[in-house]
Amino acid sequence: MLTKIGLYTGSFDPVTNGHLDIVKRASGLFDQIYVGIFDNPTKKSYFKLEVRKAMLTQALADFTNVIVVTSHERLAIDVAKELRVTHLIRGLRNATDFEYEENLEYFNHLLAPNIETVYLISRNKWQALSSSRVRELIHFQSSLEGLVPQSVIAQVEKMNEKT
């Protein structure tokens, strides 16, 4: 039987409970999942790549079939081919996400026609949540309780101690 291997990518700057919900749901659908932290060349990162990896790795520690990987200046589809991924995993919060993902899937299919894309619709409670909104809350030192994993809260508290 073919092993189903998924790749869920994002900048995870920082990881949110919405991201974790997608991973949790996907972990039951796939034999193995890679969660790929990618630097988005169109965005300036708030957290350094190694910090994002540490926060995400800690948040996903209980998942036995999930491996966190990082990539710098590479297309996710190229990493997917290298890892022998069978499916890309994408989360959809709203119609704007769908339009973006529809375009992305077109090009991914051109580059790797054998890799399918699976879309998981965000649960209602996470549809308004985004990393950019969390960064805004961090800037104004607002509570992150219930929005992000404890690893992110601990990192923010550590950063606040230094300032």
UniProtKB/Swiss-Prot annotation:
Superkingdom in the source lineage: Bacteria
Database matches in InterPro entries: Cyt_trans-like (IPR004821), PPAT (IPR001980), Rossmann-like_a/b/a_fold (IPR014729)
Organism field: Streptococcus pyogenes serotype M1
Keywords: ATP-binding, Coenzyme A biosynthesis, Cytoplasm, Magnesium, Nucleotide-binding, Nucleotidyltransferase, Transferase
Keyword Mitochondrion: no
Pfam families recorded: CTP_transf_like
GO molecular function: ATP binding; pantetheine-phosphate adenylyltransferase activity
First-listed, main subcellular location of the protein, grouped into a coarse class: cytoplasm
Role summary: Reversibly transfers an adenylyl group from ATP to 4'-phosphopantetheine, yielding dephospho-CoA (dPCoA) and pyrophosphate.
Binding site for ATP: S11, F12, H19, G91, L92, R93, E101, W126, Q127, A128, L129, S130, S131, S132
Cofactor(s) required, per the database record: Mg(2+)
Family per record: Belongs to the bacterial CoaD family.
Catalysed transformations (reactions): (R)-4'-phosphopantetheine + ATP + H(+) = 3'-dephospho-CoA + diphosphate
GO cellular component annotations of the record: cytoplasm
Subunit structure, as described in the record: Homohexamer.
Annotated protein name in UniProt: Phosphopantetheine adenylyltransferase
Pathway assignment: Cofactor biosynthesis; coenzyme A biosynthesis; CoA from (R)-pantothenate: step 4/5
Compartments, as annotated in UniProt: Cytoplasm
Main enzyme class: transferase
Record-listed E.C. numbers: 2.7.7.3
Site (Transition state stabilizer) residue list: H19
